[in-house]
A protein has these predicted regions:
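Short amphipathic alpha-helices within nucleic acid-binding modules
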Residues: 36-43
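C-terminal structural segments of small proteins and small subunits
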Residues: 66-91
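Solvent-exposed alpha-helix faces
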Residues: 43-44, 86
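Short Gly/Ser/Thr- and Asp/Glu-enriched loop/turn motifs at secondary-structure junctions
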Residues: 23, 60-64
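Short arginine-rich
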Residues: 17-21, 46-56
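A short N-terminal helical cap/helix-turn-helix that marks the beginning
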Residues: 52-59, 86-91
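Short, well-ordered beta-strand elements within core beta-sheets of diverse protein domains
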Residues: 25-33
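Short acidic N-proximal helix/loop "leader" segments that mark the beginning
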Residues: 1-21
Length: 91
């Protein structure tokens, strides 16, 4: 069952933070100068994920990190996902 988020939530995600919705998940790539900037970001995301008990898929490269988040229990994007992306965007 795919969870539908409200149009307002979609506008917030799309317009303010560049998260893309597709395949029942939210995805965003964050770009950095180099690996020394990447790893502190990854550690900060890990802390958010542990605190919220909602863990993204992360792909780490030399100068970027791709995050994808979905709610496996709900079968798609949920309010938990929305809360997670808002917290990450505050980093």
């Amino acid at each position: 069952m795919k969870i539908i988020i409200t149009e307002q939530q979609k506008k917030t995600i799309t317009n303010k933070s560049d998260w893309k919705e597709g395949n029942s998940k939210l995805t965003k790539t964050f770009y950095f100068k180099d690996y020394k900037e990447v790893m502190p970001f990854v550690n900060s995301v890990m802390k958010i994920a542990d605190k919220q008990n909602h863990h993204p898929d992360m792909t780490v490269h030399y100068d970027n990190v791709k995050l994808s988040i979905t709610d496996h229990d709900k079968g798609g994007v949920s309010e938990k996902c929305h809360k997670f992306v808002n917290a990450v965007d505050k980093l």
